[in-house]
Every structure is written in C-alpha cells, then in structure tokens.
Amino acid sequence: MQNKTVFVGISGGVDSAVSALLLKQQYREVIGIFMECWDNTLNNDQLGHRAFNEHKSGCSSKEDFREAQAIAQLLGIKLIKQNLVEPYWKQVFLPTIDAFKNGLTPNPDMLCNRLIKFGLMRDYCKQLDPNSDFATGHYAALSWDNNQPLLAIPKDKHKDQTYFLAHVKPAQLQDVVFPLAHLLKTEVRQIALAHHFSVATKKDSTGICFIGERHFSDFLKNYLPVKPGVIYDWKTQRQLGSHEGVWFYTTGQRSGLNLGGQAARNFVVEKDLKTNTLYVSSDPEDLQRRGITLSHFNWLYQPNPLTQTVLVRIRHAQPLVQGHITVQPNNVVQVQLDQPIDRVTNGQYGVLYTQNGICLGSGIITASQI
C-alpha cells in the first residue's frame, strides 16, 4: 500500500472504473477526476451528431458523468468534475479544424492527450497534491531506464493505446500509473462484473477524443463550408464525378464518393487543396508507400546508440511493420519500410517502437514515398 494520493481519470466507462478499483487496493487515497471537454450547444455540434439526428438529448457527457458518479459512490471515493470545454476548444479542436482546412487528416486524440489529459489535467492534480500520482485507464505500460519512464506496449496487444500516447512529453510520464498494463480487456470486464459495476458490459467508446461518435463528414460541416469540386481518375485523368470539398475526404476513403456505374469501387488516393480536386483509383497498389517523412518528431526515448531498425505504426491497431530510420535536422525522421503499407495520410502520426515494444516517439506524417 502506497502512502500517497493517486488521481485517476474516470470517464464513465469500464476501463477507468476498474482502474479506480485496482488503485484503491494500492494507494492510501484515490480521487477521481471527470473531465468535461465538449459542449454540444456551445460548440454548435448538431450536424452529424447521432443523438440530435435521432431526436434524443445529445447529452452523452451528462450520461457519462452520472456513470462516473455511480462508480465513485460504489468505490467510496471523491469525484472532482473539471470543466475544460474552453481549453479543449482552443488547444485541440480549433487546430484540428485548421489542419482539415489545409487538406490534412489530423488526429485530435494525440493533441488531447498531450495538452489536456497529461497537460492541464495532470498539472491540476499536481497543484492539489505535488506528491501525488496520476492514473488513466489506457491500455499502456511503463518500463524504466535510469529512473526515466518509458512508454511500452501492454499485455493486451489488441487494445494497445500507446499510439495515442506517443506525442506526450517525456516529463508528462513521471508519476503516471497505468493500472491496466497487465490485463486483457476480457479480464477487465470480468473484474467489473465481479464487483457489480453497472458499466461492466458498456460498449467501448469510439470516435473523437471527448466528442464521441459522429457521421464525420456531416460533423465537419458544422465548422467547414461545402466547396464543390471535381473528382478525377488518378491514372487516366478522366473526370468521374464531383465532391463537396477536399477537406471532407481522406486518403483511402471509399464511402461518400457517389461514383456509381464504375467497373470497380474507387477510393481517394490524392487531394489537391489548391485546385480543390480529388483523385481516385480502384487499384490498391496506388495506396501503397514504402517511405514516410515524420516532422515535429517527439522523442520519448533515445537509446544510446540509437537503433536504426524500428517497428512502425501509422494508425491505431495497425499491425507493426519493420523499417529503418534516418534522423535528419529540425526534428525530422525519415522512415524506409521493409514492406509497403497503404493509406499513409498526411496529418496523421507515425509512431516508432523498438523491437521489444518500447515507444521511441512519434511525428506528424508530412510526406510519403512510393
């Protein structure tokens, strides 16, 4: 039993509930933190919102808070509700919209973890108790090298969330605890059922960090204008149809193209922001890339000597692919892959790992090579 306080993020889901339960067995005091980061009304979130479209309340954050309160009451712990709607809007959401405007496909979860969860929220907890630890229900693990915490792949490889954590600052991992590091998701649900948690069978949350599931192109229309343009065949340059604006589409996307009558199903292979043009293809090889340029690289771990052979992931849950890196000036890392991967998308993140599952860090994909 650790004679100190641990703050734990409680979202109203099963993972954070079981995390809080496990921490109660390990710490003198456990305090739950519920982060409210999105307001449907203030943020004009109507188009694409499933609850609004189905004539429901649309107040998923209120429902989540009620679940969090029930968990805290069952465990006998204090729960603090922290309103972070404004900083989330300014620091995470507006930069995300700006990236879409620039033709990129950003990942707001990366910014959210760095700036909100492990930024403002962790800092707030440290202000309340400088000696406290900070815990979340992420499926991630920590290893150690000379008192430096290293982000590592957890036991449950299928639920591994280290991809989303790879852009936090190294210092933000100090005094952090991941209670689910050595558990499978099935084991987490079994623990929740055994302790009669109402969220034991609750569906896993998906969608955008703190916003949830949306019909995504419709959701973006709350914040970006419709701007009709032309769709061309990537190889023949033949005009195939029209679209509503390149920022509503991403590399590899098949749905929403409305290209009926084609011999094979097409997908997006290129976006030209200047001319507002989409290029599509039905040949999967047109999506494949062997080289990736990562900019603004955030090093979580730099072993000495730095390994040149790494494992690479360009999206959550994608199988790891081996590659070789060249470190360039200005925090740029060039990756050459041993085998091609598809749907390499500018604006997304490339995350690098050692062969034994330690996360080296992440960078924003700014270019790719055939």
UniProtKB/Swiss-Prot annotation:
Its EC number is 2.8.1.13. CDD domains: MnmA_TRMU-like. Residues 159-161 are annotated as: Interaction with tRNA. It catalyses: S-sulfanyl-L-cysteinyl-[protein] + uridine(34) in tRNA + AH2 + ATP = 2-thiouridine(34) in tRNA + L-cysteinyl-[protein] + A + AMP + diphosphate + H(+). GO terms for cellular component: cytoplasm. The active site is at residues 112, 209. Pfam families: tRNA_Me_trans, tRNA_Me_trans_C, tRNA_Me_trans_M. Keywords: ATP-binding, Cytoplasm, Disulfide bond, Nucleotide-binding, RNA-binding, Transferase, tRNA processing, tRNA-binding. The record marks 138, 348 as: Interaction with tRNA. SUPFAM superfamilies: Adenine nucleotide alpha hydrolases-like. Disulfide bonds join 112-209. The keyword tRNA-binding applies. Residues 107-109 are annotated as: Interaction with target base in tRNA. It is found in: Cytoplasm. ATP binds at residues 9-16, 35, 137. GO terms for molecular function: ATP binding; tRNA binding; tRNA-uridine 2-sulfurtransferase activity. GO terms for biological process: tRNA wobble position uridine thiolation. InterPro entries: MnmA-like, MnmA-like_C, MnmA-like_central, MnmA-like_central_sf, Rossmann-like_a/b/a_fold. It comes from the Bacteria. HAMAP family: tRNA_thiouridyl_MnmA. Belongs to the MnmA/TRMU family. PANTHER family: MITOCHONDRIAL TRNA-SPECIFIC 2-THIOURIDYLASE 1, TRNA 5-METHYLAMINOMETHYL-2-THIOURIDYLATE -METHYLTRANSFERASE. Catalyzes the 2-thiolation of uridine at the wobble position (U34) of tRNA, leading to the formation of s(2)U34. This is tRNA-specific 2-thiouridylase MnmA. It comes from Mycoplasma pneumoniae (strain ATCC 29342 / M129 / Subtype 1). The gene is mnmA.
